[in-house]
């Protein structure tokens, strides 16, 4: 039995959502082959860092390679479209054909079934994040053989909106949380009285960055009492242009003026490892954002939140904006000083209980680490698959 965990992205932010499962599978005595497949050097480095001695010993590491044609195409189009990410499947079909199970964090892997005909390959989706956006619950989710999810909110929406069969969904908690169990928050800006994490999403139709981001930075430059960690979604500045397909938009994140880079109370991180490993969501006192699912990681410990509705959405009562119930929603950075001034009081009098309810509906956590729960599901699915294969083989032999 060959089970592979695929990491195929420009950035490392998805690794923490499924690599802990591979590690738990290896430590739990799974008797099949466990493989981690990466598509670039950045991902390989992150996998080796988190996986330690298991990578290359109990867990085989395969580095997928693009063809020369893909490399040429990618060099021309990579500023707009992730061609290498899309074509890596075609270029490595023999590897994917050799697998029984493929565990993935994203949906482009469904190309293996839909375009390349690998219908016998069982693909398990771990998801990456526990956010509320509709794209996380689109019909593509029903194309997976099994989906692992964090809690009842996600399961219920997958069944109701994506059409996933209830038998094809398992609640396992949130494996990424296993990586920070017992860790203490870092003090990122020690001179600041309070630290705010500004975490805008890359999607132009949802993000506050394109319209209001520089005004947000300006506010903190002039208000040194509050420290600012500007750690946007790692894909906001990854390419020259941001292209979204769920609602087609193209925009440019642009440059960050030098004056913000020199601010003593401003920490800017556009995509380092810390942007993906919960360092900043643990370290901040207040969350400021728009559509990123990292809000739910921030709620691991309830704290004040502020949301910037830069597009004037009518959001109340809409499940795609459920996370905005965790704090005050403002329409402009001009409202930020007052929102920050009352954030602590509003948190205690209005939002703390709501946050705890939201966290409980989003994450089903217990004393068993989430990665071990996920590994148990994969082991069961693999055993069921092996049993069915043996029965089919015996039946074929008996009728021969």
Which stretches of residues belong to each language-model region?
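Structural loop-to-beta junction motif characteristic of Rossmann-like glycosyltransferase folds
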Residues: 121, 286, 302-306
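Nucleotide-sugar donor-binding and catalytic loop/hinge architecture
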Residues: 1, 182-197, 221-222, 363, ...
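A nucleotide-sugar donor-handling region in carbohydrate enzymes
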Residues: 143-212, 234-238, 355-356
